[in-house]
Design a protein with these regions (language model features):
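Short alpha-helix plus adjacent loop in nuclease-associated cores
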Residues: 1, 144-151, 178-179, 271-294, ...
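Conserved P-loop NTPase-based nucleic-acid remodeling module centered on helicase motor cores
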Residues: 1-37, 42, 46-55, 66, ...
Length: 337
């Protein structure tokens, strides 16, 4: 059967409906927070029942497990999967159907995995099952760069790789081609404090380069004021042109303070990057039309395009159709018919 893959916006819309039905106040418990708990459970290959057992007396975890159960039921009704399900369902298929597993083991005899330090438990299980027959597995990763535990990454996957695959050959790539030695020395000094890591020392044939300057600030406002002030000073004293300066930041939200300070100081700037193509409204609308054609049971897609372009259909009418669909236990599309 055809099925729809829900992206982050689809998941949030679905979770909002579930919270409404379960009388959960989304001002106190955010949809994103519940989805993150569910995603973490799927990363660990836990179903709703297992998550509830693990919750013990933790009220928040128990509630998340109950929401998880309703969330999965809603996905089934809509004939949809989320991104985590693509791995989880494949692992379940491989574990329960040996013939299917063998088919794909024959198809993919040689497997390569990049950024292995960022893999979660479900991904590790998936790769282990697929590679278990021929063990032609090459993974590339750096345990020192494992920073995504909050997203479910399990550093044990790379630290314990030789234990799971005892015949593996480990090749350390310690020469760096991008950075100066001063930058590498600083990095080596910081990461040496980590007691659970694979020993390695980065080095380069590049020049030593300039010394690193470290500044620490109480908040983002102080940081932006200092950085923009330093750029203005360098330009004023003829040390650098504006186009010689770049500010790197991890999240888009951080750019606002720097932009405000640049505007205040009359410093021209350019933001590199923009809205993701598939996150644009018109693209999502078009994709939902295609989803509806392919899978009319996808309520989220049907409701999104119902009034695109505008047809004078209000929220009250949509609500009545949804109530009828819920009462008759049919899809939103069938209720419209």
């Amino acid at each position: 059967n055809n099925f729809t893959i829900y992206d982050a916006d689809d998941q949030k819309t679905l979770m909002k409906e579930i919270c409404r039905k379960m009388n959960i106040d989304t001002k106190k418990v955010r949809e994103r927070a519940l989805l993150a708990q569910i995603s973490h459970a799927k990363d660990e290959l836990l179903n709703p029942d297992e998550m509830e057992v693990n919750a013990g007396a933790d009220f928040n975890q128990k509630r998340a497990a109950q929401v998880y159960r309703e969330y999965q039921a809603a996905l089934r009704r809509n004939n949809a999967l989320d991104f985590d399900d693509l791995i989880v369902k494949t692992v379940e298929l491989f574990q329960n159907c040996d013939d299917v597993l063998q088919t794909y083991q024959e198809r993919f005899r040689y497997i390569m995995v990049d950024e292995y330090q960022d893999t979660n438990t479900a991904q590790f299980k998936f790769v282990s099952l697929l590679a278990s027959r021929y063990e032609n597995l090459c993974v590339v990763g750096d345990d020192d760069q494992s920073i995504y535990k909050f997203r479910g990454a399990n550093i044990g996957n790379i630290l314990g790789f030789e234990r799971v695959f005892p015949n593996a050959k480990v090749i350390r790539l310690e020469q760096n081609y991008r950075s100066t030695q001063n930058i590498l020395d600083a990095a080596n000094g910081v990461i040496a404090n980590n007691t659970e890591r694979k020993e390695k020392t980065l080095w380069t044939e590049n020049p030593e380069g300039e010394k690193i300057h470290f500044r620490q600030f109480m908040n983002g406002y102080e940081e932006a004021e200092y950085v923009v002030g330093d750029i203005a000073k360098r330009h004023r004293e003829g040390m650098a042109d504006y186009h010689d300066c770049a500010v790197l930041y991890r999240t888009n939200a951080q750019s606002r303070l720097f932009e405000e300070k640049c505007l205040h100081a009359n410093i021209p700037y350019k933001i590199v990057g923009g809205v993701n193509f598939y996150a644009r409204k018109e693209i999502k609308d078009l994709l939902c039309y295609l989803k509806t054609v392919d899978n009319a049971a996808d309520d989220l897609a049907v409701r999104r395009i119902l009034n695109v372009p505008k047809r004078g259909i209000g929220a009250t009418t949509v609500g009545r159709v949804q109530d009828y669909a819920d009462m008759m236990n049919i899809s939103f599309y069938d209720a419209l018919r």
